[in-house]
Design a protein with these regions (language model features):
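An N-terminal hydrophobic leader/cap segment in hydrolases
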Residues: 16-61, 68-71
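Active-site glycine-rich loops that stabilize anionic/oxyanionic intermediates
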Residues: 79, 85-90
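Conserved alpha/beta-hydrolase
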Residues: 92, 99-125
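Alpha/beta-hydrolase-fold enzymes
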Residues: 170-260
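Short beta-strand/loop motif that positions the catalytic acidic residue
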Residues: 287, 293-295, 299
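Catalytic active-site module of serine/aspartate enzymes centered on a nucleophile-bearing elbow/loop
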Residues: 318, 323-359
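Alpha/beta-hydrolase active-site loop
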Residues: 130-150
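Short alpha-helix in the alpha/beta-hydrolase fold that links the catalytic acid
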Residues: 289, 303-313
């Protein structure tokens, strides 16, 4: 692919490729339910050529002087633009198949690599530590991305699609910037951390005390209890998906591009996430747009009860979630966008129906 690198405002580097023509999106949702049986063929004949010829990649420099990377695909005569806020550990490279599916339904798509992961700059010496000082750093990066990159290229409706940690970032974003998105989709949103048998108030106190102590002795936030560097567990032991094909492809991408690899979270990240979630739930009255919450029935990564509480509270505030409660995806693990064909196609069908509904 030939790329033209441009120097724009805020030191934006952009790799330009051919836009998707409107005539190209005639994607049948029925195809989504039978893709795994020929997944290697799909990757070689469809996804790889699409990613190489249709996807634009670039970066901008944020207020902390960090390089924030992103990718996008513009669709001619798009019915809207989807901004993807990925989960922890993720970058746009992990979203290749989802980006493809969204464009085939007529949406332009923009994906950000949050700071500290993907191809974006990492703040600690050990690049595999999951760290952020404050979730508002993520939120400000996302706003710069939307303001300086997305909106100059798309003047129509914007939709937020977020996953896991990206859901916590996305929730804080729509609370602080209520007029940017028309609708928001939250997939397995990280609105509650599993503290095990320890009551949450006590766990929060422990997190804060330990984090305070570690900041006295080092500016390199240590791994949270039991944390380690990048560890690609075998499929049989994974907590993310029941799709062996998609899991293996995701891991192969991270092997091919080691800069994407990220390990466990740090005490600093835990403190920042707990504070962000607490603030978000205190400000649910600021959520004004239509929202859909997709919940994985067998999620072992985050706490589903927090999603139930979110929709319950929004209903009391007069802005109920679609279906009034989280939409439970049966037989699905945490990563709905790389799940097996049946739950994944159900997820996409619900998203497309929600976004296309004018009510």
């Amino acid at each position: 692919m030939k790329c033209i690198y441009l120097l724009l405002l805020l030191s934006v580097g952009v790799c330009v490729s051919v836009p998707v023509e409107s005539k190209e999106y005639n994607h049948e949702l029925s195809e989504l339910n039978q893709r795994e049986s020929t997944y290697s063929t799909f990757l070689a004949d469809t996804l790889s050529p699409f990613w190489q010829t249709k996807v634009n990649k670039g970066h901008f420099v944020n207020r902390q002087q960090l390089n924030i990377h992103y990718a996008y695909v513009k669709v001619a005569d798009a019915q809207g633009a989807i901004v993807i806020s990925p989960g922890r550990v993720e970058g746009y490279e992990k979203y290749q198949e989802l980006v493809y599916d969204f464009t085939q339904q007529g949406y332009s798509v923009f994906v950000i690599d949050h700071q500290g992961q993907g191809l974006s700059s990492r703040r600690l010496t050990n690049k595999e530590k999951g760290y952020v000082e404050d979730f508002d750093d993520y939120v400000m990066d996302l706003d710069q991305f939307i303001t300086d990159i997305v909106k100059p290229m798309h003047q129509g409706k914007l939709y937020l699609v977020s996953h896991s940690m990206g859901g916590a970032i996305g929730l804080r974003y729509v609370q602080q910037h209520p007029n940017q998105f028309s609708k928001a989709v939250f997939s397995s949103p990280m609105w509650g951390l599993n503290s095990g048998a320890i009551p949450k108030p006590i766990a929060k106190g422990i997190f804060n005390v330990v984090n305070w102590f570690t900041t006295l002795v080092t500016d390199q936030s240590p791994y949270f209890f039991g944390g380690q560097g990048y560890n690609p567990v075998e499929f049989e032991s994974n907590q993310l998906t029941t799709s062996k094909q998609r899991y293996q492809y995701f891991r192969s991408v991270y092997v091919a591009k080691p800069d994407l690899q990220l390990g466990s979270v740090t005490f600093g990240w835990i403190r920042a996430s707990v504070n962000a979630i607490d603030t978000a739930f205190k400000q649910l009255n600021l959520v004004k747009l239509p929202v859909m919450v997709l919940q994985a029935e067998n999620d072992e990564v985050i706490e589903n009860e927090a999603q139930n509480a979110f929709c319950s509270e929004l209903a009391k505030l007069g802005n109920p979630c679609v279906n009034d409660t989280p939409i439970v995806i049966n037989n699905a693990k945490h990563e709905l966008f790389i799940e097996s064909d049946k739950p994944r196609s159900e997820v996409l069908a619900k998203i497309f129906m929600f976004l296309s509904d004018n009510d």
